Structure formats: C-alpha cells, structure tokens
Amino acid sequence: LKEIKSSTTEALRKFYERDGYKLLQSTATFENLKLLASFWNDVSNQNKERFSDKVLRRLFVLNYAPNSMWTYFTSVYFMHYKDEDGSLDDDRFYTFLCKTTAFVWAYALTNPGLNSLRTPIFAEMVNIIKGKDVAFADYKFDIQQFKNIFNNYKFFNGRPLTKSMITWWAYNSDDQELMSLETVIEIEHIYARNRFEKEHSLTSKEIVESLGNKAILEKRINIRASDYRFEDKKKYYNGYETPRGPKAGTKIRE
C-alpha cells in the first residue's frame, strides 16, 4: 500500500514498530496473516478443492524456480485479489502464474541473481496493488539478445535454472500428471554421462550437458538408471516385475 519500490528489504521489526506498532497490533493484520498462511498451506498440500489442475501444475513448476522471489510476488497478488472467502479467480490467477514463470525464467538468464530480480518484481508489486494487470512493461527483453544468451548458456546440473527449465518443459505436455510436491526429483541424463566418459562415443561433451539430453526423473529411479544404456534404462523408466512384486516406473511422461 505504501508503493515501496526500493530493492533494499527493510527489517521486519523496523517496519512494524512505526507509530507505536500500530500496524502489528491491528486486528486486520492478524486476520490477513491467517488468510495468507491458509493460502500457502493449500498450495503446499495441492488442495484440488481450492485450485484447478492447471493452476496446481503451474505452482508445481514454480516450486522449482531458480529463486524464491515468486512466492513474495504471489503473496502480494493473493492479498490484493482475494475474495471475501479468500478465493481467487482461477483463470486470472493462472494467467498471472504463467506470466510470472516466463519472466522469472527469462530474467534468470539475462540478469542472474536474486537481488537483480527484486527491482522488476517490486515495481510490479506496486502495479498489482494499483489494480493493473501484470505485464512487466518496463522490463521487456530484446528478442535477439535473449536468443544469444539462451543459446550460449551452459545448462550444467549445478545451476538451479537447469532443473527449472526441464521441469517447465515436462509440464508443457498436457499428458503430464500432477506430481506431489514431496516427490524428490533429480536431473536425468538420457544418454548417461558416465557412459560418455567411459566410451567417448559422442563428438562433444556439450551434447551430454545440453537441455535436450536431460529430463526430470524421480530420485528412486535415477539412482538405478544413472549408468545404463538407453535400451537398458527403458526397463526402469517403464517399470518392471520382480519376484517381490512390481517396481513402478516414472510418472514423467516425457
């Protein structure tokens, strides 16, 4: 409400101690905190009575964002647009999540680091409380420059954006079912990295580390399948029978 655009985050106590802790002692503040806590609890539990499948899928993808700034941004959106019962317009919320995903992913490429993202996000927070649609109008990307950055970016496994990108790609498929947020997923090299190091059967290691050779995969499967040839991996991807019963395959449709 104060339209603060500064990217320097004010200390929590300093913010609330103004006017003799008037804001902190307000009944409305406590009620708003309860509503916000309930919202995030339902996000965490993937409450299908509160959110549509398409919204829950976008929230799953954002859970693997390269940083946590989207959560603060979403909190501001919720507090401004919630109905009296704490609900949101589903289609409008879905559009907001899609725009947020696109911007956060792209900005992580062109301006890496959490601190740099604060400037456009804080400015857009002000637009939200003014009732304006999220558009990031003052932070448009140059298409050719962005393509150059994307094409030259090294998507190593240690970089958070790598898992962000392949999670987003997996959920671009309408056939991809919603997975639990408690599922531990890792990055799978479809052509195993260890096989390349042993056999040197590809022309370049860059091919092994390219996005096209990577997919998200549940940790329980990735541990078993990590060093196998693709023909052997399919057994673990699809699931198989053992004397003790069936071993489930991956839920990743890709």
Spans of features found by a protein language model:
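A cross-family structural signal marking well-folded subdomains
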Residues: 1-164
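Betabetaalpha-Me/HNH-type nuclease active-site subdomain
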Residues: 122-253
